[in-house]
């Protein structure tokens, strides 16, 4: 059964969880944005499909409805799709909208948060 994972890359170097790293190492497709460190993509298998959907305030390579469509399409096509998001998928990341779109399409999905800034800031202070 195919599945899409919304993986938060965390707030910086070393903030990706072990579960997130494991999913990247075993994914067949990664859909990623511009707010993450490119080095994370080196964890993906060489034959992994890579789809860039970069978004920053005022600049979008793909709008949110297009990203949702891409995620549904990938969820149908690939056994393991990782939607890799900078930071936390649910803090300004629109992860909730993406999960709702996947569920509405009948695609199995799971959220895998990275280390969020609320925790990282306190720990690193």
Residue ranges and their predicted role:
Residues 1-14, 18-115, 120:
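Class I S-adenosyl-L-methionine
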Residues 122-125:
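Anionic-ligand binding region
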């Amino acid at each position: 059964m195919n599945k899409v994972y919304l993986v938060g890359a965390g707030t910086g170097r070393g903030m990706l969880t072990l579960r997130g790293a494991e999913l990247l190492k075993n994914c067949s497709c990664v859909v990623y944005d511009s707010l993450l460190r490119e080095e994370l993509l080196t964890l993906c298998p060489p034959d992994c499909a890579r789809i860039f959907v970069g978004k920053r305030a005022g600049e979008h390579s793909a709008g949110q409805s297009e990203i949702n469509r891409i995620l549904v399409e990938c969820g149908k096509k690939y056994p393991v799709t990782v939607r890799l998001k900078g930071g936390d998928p649910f803090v300004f990341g629109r992860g909730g909208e993406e999960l709702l779109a996947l569920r509405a399409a009948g695609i199995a999905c799971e959220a895998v948060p990275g280390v969020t800034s609320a925790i990282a800031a306190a720990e690193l202070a």
